[in-house]
């Protein structure tokens, strides 16, 4: 959800994008997509940008809801039945950046809807939303657990960090030369953007209690953690996954403190 231009804008499981009057809550307009809308909209220059599970990314006039353009993404190259956009967009210098379940990360011209460039991610979805700062775009992947830094203008890869297949749903936050992002491992990672490495990590209480979830080299022990339980009891499997203390929400940095929530039920404030 985003508030801008006197309106409140959000997507819904009924496939609509809604615009409400911020003062009264009355409906200004709604726009029907072809599937559910999980992503939060971004607004720039009076245009609303948001993706849908119908595999299209939309640009709408924020005042009227009129479609300005739509951009068609693809399908997962491995599973082939996975499409759609969960990543919220970032807009900078006339370009819209977003990830997709077709395993690509896209840069699209904000005015025309034409692709500027795309970056493939080896069969891994990009659910995490990007951050853009000082000519660079930052995002992370799900299945492969990679954190990428690309040149925002050209899409040229600058460097990547490998988090050993621990998925990222959390989106990055940048403050004071440090980027903060959480993973399914239950760790908040502080990445020094100048040194291009992890400066420190914080482990949630749930993560500390679930040593069997990791192998000796730090990669996920899926068999011990999830698969046996999922096959026998879906409810127990989900509970086990949540108990790992994964960080699915995005951190917020304010002053000298970073705030983040976890599936272990805690909200943490770190200094």
Each PLM stretch: what is its role?
Residues 7, 47, 95-97, 136, ...:
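Conserved core beta-strand positions within WD40 beta-propeller blades
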Residues 242-271:
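Blade-level signature of beta-propeller repeat domains, shared across WD40, Kelch, NHL, RCC1
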Residues 184-187:
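Repeat-solenoid scaffold signature
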Residues 21-25, 61-65, 109-113, 151-155, ...:
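Short loop/turn segments that connect beta-strands within beta-propeller blades
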Residues 1-4, 13-14, 29-44, 53, ...:
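Extracytoplasmic beta-rich repeat domains
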